[in-house]
Amino acid sequence: MIGTTTIDNGPTTIFSSKLLSRGQKDLFNNALKVESSDFIKTSANRIKPVFLKAAHKNVVITSKNGVEALLNNCAAEDLNFETIYCVGRRTKRLIEQKIGPVKHSEKNAKALAKYLVEFIEGSEVTYFCSDIRMDDLPTILEESNIKVQEIEAYSTKLEAPKLGKSIEGVMFYSPSTIQSFLQKNTPECIAYCIGESTAKEAKKYFKDVRVAKIPTVESVIELVNQNYI
């Protein structure tokens, strides 16, 4: 059931669509009042262990949530993935810590798809994704006659609150966080985006869209600070 909670604690200037740690909040300029909450909540779907234990030549994982969902269904040592590709440095780090080596990573799904079209060995990939995802990767691969076997590894729920009118900017970390925001809010503020895929979605609705130099929360914070020097 959709609630009607409104967050408006006075002169809040910036809102993060992901819960921030105390250390991250301390990185903002002192003049800013910053609030945060998780605009999306994820939960692992059940994937049959027999499927995960079968041989998969080319595996694509586009988020840390996908990694965690896999490990929720099957022990890492039982996964039979020959070659792993992923999106994002933090996703790569988690995969290599928990599962095994990553052959190649890119900063977004579109860039990874273009790489795979050029360099993949074979003509099929197994793509572990959310029930809510962008079309870039499967579309680009299938247009190049690369078969995509999509597995919904986790589900995404949109749970953004209604924000107060004092908000001047919102920090977004995925296209899903933007869709969540739009369920109860109007795009009248600045959209600070973690990367190009998120910015592409934001530009459909927001007049002022800004993109971090590197895809990290800290880089988005730096982007915000630049507007309040």
Each predicted region: which residue ranges?
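Signature of uroporphyrinogen-III synthase
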Residues: 1-229
